[in-house]
Amino acid sequence: MAITAAQVKELRDRTGAGMMDCKNALTETNGDMELAIDNMRKSGAAKAAKKAGNIAADGTILIKNGEGFAALLEVNCQTDFVAKDSNFLAFANAVLDAAAASKVTLEDLKAQFEDARVALVTKIGENINIRRVEYIDGANLSSYRHGERIGVVVAGEADEETLKHIAMHVAASKPEYVNPEDVPAEIVAREQALQIEMSMNEGKSAEIAEKMVLGRMKKFTGEISLTGQAYIMEPKKTVGEILKEKGAKVTNFIRLEVGEGIEKKEEDFAAEVAAQIAASKKA
């Protein structure tokens, strides 16, 4: 099976590993993305974290409430300078207003604002992209924006201050699910199988490995779920414990961050200047 550039890029985005590592991993698994990720974790090829400069595109996250829902929008540009430009922000807010008016789909937003986008690109000189729009329903919603780059909306049954603090926690801690039991069964099963294999590779018997994995799995589902995480304002307690104390409940949340999954090209300014000088000498 031929491995495509798109597959390699997806694996790079998800693991932070090098291009050749990703291509080799996909070749070995005949294009099976999930198996490639598991194999890379075992071999240590996947990096623990990706450099922010390799994934962070610029732009803004905007939030606006509609009737019984909230809209979250990401609009991208190429530089942080343009992200603060009044023309760019006016365009982004116009798109947001349309989205919040009637839950317009991303495709319809792109079509509706294509002429305005093209005009803005011509005026500013950078590529502009309406990247994402998400909607969250709820009679009781609280939002939080961390600068221009992170936006969170939380839906739940709690007082305004509690929901606001939970939204701030979501912004900082990046949970993927509300509760540990919300983690899909296939994700749990895959992680459990991987942990058992890794434990046995450490020389543990199958019986001991399974017991060790029980604790690891509780930690795994807790770390990626909101109520299982340590609360940033009281780290000795989980978010779930804080909510229980307050008689509160979170039913859903959405968190968007500018540039998630986008690899931003590293610019070598010195090399660029040298190339320009060399070109001018040839002219």
Swiss-Prot record:
Compartments it resides in: Cytoplasm
SUPFAM superfamilies registered for this protein in UniProt: Elongation factor Ts (EF-Ts), dimerisation domain (SSF54713), UBA-like (SSF46934)
This protein's record includes keyword Magnesium: no
Chaperone is among the record's keywords: no
Keywords attached to this entry: Cytoplasm, Elongation factor, Protein biosynthesis
S-S pairs: none
Domain of life: Bacteria
Pfam families noted in UniProt: EF_TS (PF00889)
Stored PROSITE patterns: EF_TS_1 (PS01126), EF_TS_2 (PS01127)
Major site of localization recorded for this protein: cytoplasm
Family in the record: Belongs to the EF-Ts family.
Cited function: Associates with the EF-Tu.GDP complex and induces the exchange of GDP to GTP. It remains bound to the aminoacyl-tRNA.EF-Tu.GTP complex up to the GTP hydrolysis stage on the ribosome.
Protein name as catalogued: Elongation factor Ts
